[in-house]
């Protein structure tokens, strides 16, 4: 269900800014592309305006895909997309999926891996290439029982990002497995008192 009155406050933006960690510009650009597809150029301009209101004096047009920027900025753009486009949890989930779909670096690379297991084992390395905050742990993959477990440790920005990551990880799994019938569930969450985020991916 949409939260019609959802609005990011300057206090929330300042709290995010104090959390350390960086992300590649390619991720931010992918999220801005989602905003453009859903709300057009006007929605992107509104995000730029709101960023300045919240104390982020950065030109979105100057973001380079291979440069690193604060993860707080990336998260704030996702929150502002929710605010401006009136997104629900499903919309945030789809934004996460699109982040992989429009990436000119990650999705094509994943398609080269013949073995889903090898890609699963390399997942922590890809996380480190994209994000300089937290870590991804490839816990277990059982190809016979058709499930995999991954954990994200040391990452706590905003509860909505759990839905974003679910969408991203689901798209990764569908790309690697070459299957459409894939499901994902977050079974542990730091915002619910757990020590890390844990996701179970199942497929048929």
Model-derived segments and spans:
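Short terminal or interdomain "cap/linker" segment that borders an active site or interface and mediates
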Residues: 2-25, 128-166, 170, 174-204
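Amphipathic interaction/junction segments at domain boundaries or subunit interfaces
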Residues: 62-164, 181-182, 188
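Short, mixed-charge aromatic SLiMs
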Residues: 51-60, 101-106, 188-200
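N-terminal low-complexity or simple alpha-helical regulatory segments
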Residues: 2-101
């Amino acid at each position: 269900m949409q939260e019609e009155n959802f609005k990011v406050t300057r206090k929330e933006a300042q709290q995010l800014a104090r959390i350390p960690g960086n992300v590649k510009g390619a991720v931010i650009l992918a999220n801005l592309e989602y905003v453009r597809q859903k709300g057009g150029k006007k929605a992107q301009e509104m995000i730029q305006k709101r960023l300045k209101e919240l104390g982020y004096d950065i030109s979105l047009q100057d973001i380079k895909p291979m440069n690193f920027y604060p993860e707080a900025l990336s998260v704030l753009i996702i929150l502002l997309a929710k605010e401006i486009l009136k997104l629900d949890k499903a919309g945030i989930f789809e934004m996460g999926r699109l982040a992989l779909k429009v990436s000119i670096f990650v999705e094509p690379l994943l398609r080269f891996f013949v073995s889903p297991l090898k890609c699963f084992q390399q997942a922590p390395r890809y996380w480190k290439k994209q994000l300089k905050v937290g870590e991804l742990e490839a816990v277990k993959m059982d190809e016979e029982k058709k499930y995999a477990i991954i954990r994200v440790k040391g990452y706590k920005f905003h509860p909505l990002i759990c839905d974003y990551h679910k969408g991203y990880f689901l798209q990764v799994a569908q790309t690697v497995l070459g299957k459409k019938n894939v499901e994902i569930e977050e079974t542990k969450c730091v915002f619910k008192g757990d020590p890390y985020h844990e996701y179970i991916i199942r497929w048929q």
